[in-house]
Amino acid sequence: MTEKKHKNSLSLVHSIKEELKKDKLAMISTIFLVAVFLIVYIYSMFLKQSNYVDVNIMDQYLAPLTNGHLLGTDNGGRDIIMMLMISARNSFNIAFAVTLITLVVGNILGVITGYFGGRFDLIFMRFTDFVMILPSMMIIIVFVTIIPRFNSWSLIGIISIFSWIGTTRLIRARTMTEVNRDYVRASKTSGTSDFKIMFREIWPNLSTLVIAEATLVFAGNIGLETGLSFLGFGLPAGTPSLGTMINEATNPETMTDKPWTWVPATVVILIVVLAIIFIGNALRRVADQRQATR
């Protein structure tokens, strides 16, 4: 069994490599994303909180290439590149955390409901239908407003309440297909426990789909966090975010006369999300190919 899993993992890696070789856009996107994450997190490691909290009015709204500021400064006299790195790190952290929770909850519930089916599955699916029709954005905004001592963890928890539904339904649908395959029937006949069948036999066969889903969920979470922060309902006040940087564009004067304060963040979000989507589409094709050949 261990040798078989090892071969499957090698086959998965090989399939992904081959797809990336064929899809040059996905390959370039992968290299670009790795570079972005390395630059953002390594750069952030060497910054102190005072670097992006302290205000220097004398350097307020300096234009790019002025006094050593390559992209200029913001309304607090802080370097735009520095703020961009910190903001990107914070936005990525929120997206990573929500994506992790989404995948864990979505995979567990999806495999369980898809495996057992029956009345439990019916009731659970009606519950997810109800949650999906709720105005999640409005509810998140309400929670952000009323929760005392709101912080980054609060935001992660609130977003995660609604984020697992899509992943659960996707994993459930694929699990229901796997349940009817011969290897599952053979395991049931041999007396293998339901837990082992679900998470040692079925779930590994969904790994490509899970990876593809993770990339797309991550892209969506970056967009959601950015949107909430742009509206003023994201990260706590004083915490830099790509959304709060873009919020500078709501000031007509800043939007037209000082575009360097918000354009860099907009460009970063656009390119990063597009790169993730290109990678996700390539991984989804790998998942579909592996499913078709089984």
From Swiss-Prot:
It is found in: Cell membrane. Its main location: membrane. It comes from the Bacteria. InterPro entries: BP-dependent_transpt_permease, MetI-like, MetI-like_sf. GO terms for biological process: peptide transport; protein transport; transmembrane transport. The chain crosses the membrane at residues 27-47, 94-114, 127-147, 151-171, 202-224, 260-280. It is a multi-pass membrane protein. Keywords: Cell membrane, Membrane, Peptide transport, Protein transport, Transmembrane, Transmembrane helix, Transport. Belongs to the binding-protein-dependent transport system permease family. OppBC subfamily. Part of the ABC transporter complex OppABCDF involved in the uptake of oligopeptides. Probably responsible for the translocation of the substrate across the membrane. Essential for uptake of peptides larger than three amino acids and for growth in milk. This is Oligopeptide transport system permease protein OppC. The lineage of its organism: Bacteria, Bacillati, Bacillota, Bacilli, Lactobacillales. The gene is oppC.
